[in-house]
A protein has these predicted regions:
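Terminal helix/beta-alpha structural elements that buttress the NAD(P)+-binding lobe
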Residues: 1-131
């Protein structure tokens, strides 16, 4: 499926899932590809740990994997550097993102299940009030 969706391979991958998804990406990622790992939701909640089978591609393709946890970088938010750097990129559409907004806190369980099951792409937002 990834070969069909990314016929030229993958250069950058933002990983929030880990497990089988990471394994598939390692097969498809291009030489010198970069992976930013910000979470491994597939490995949480007492699930059996998925053994990554394609680790050999990290060396064979010179892939870089970097872990990232936001609280290690709060100083950039607090001093305004993040906003000064990222906002112009968003305004010039040099950074693309997807978000899906749903209304009503009563719908949260349904959308959470759909999100975890991969039915949504991008950030899922539940709007509970107009501010």
């Amino acid at each position: 499926a990834l070969a069909r969706l990314a016929p030229n391979g993958i250069d950058y991958f933002y990983d929030t899932v880990g497990g089988e998804i990471l394994d598939l990406v390692l097969e498809t990622i291009n030489e010198r590809g970069k992976i930013l790992s910000v979470g491994m939701i597939s490995q949480e909640n007492g699930k059996e740990q998925y053994p990554i089978r394609n680790l050999r591609y990290i060396a064979a393709k010179s892939v870089s994997i970097h872990g990232f946890i936001y609280w290690h970088h709060l100083k950039y938010w607090e001093n305004g550097e993040l906003d000064n750097t990222v906002r112009p990129l968003l305004e010039k559409k040099e950074i693309n993102y997807r978000e899906q907004v749903f209304e009503g806190v009563e719908n949260t369980p349904e959308h959470f299940v759909n999100m975890v099951n991969g039915k949504y792409a991008g950030k899922v937002i539940i709007k509970i009030a107009d501010l």
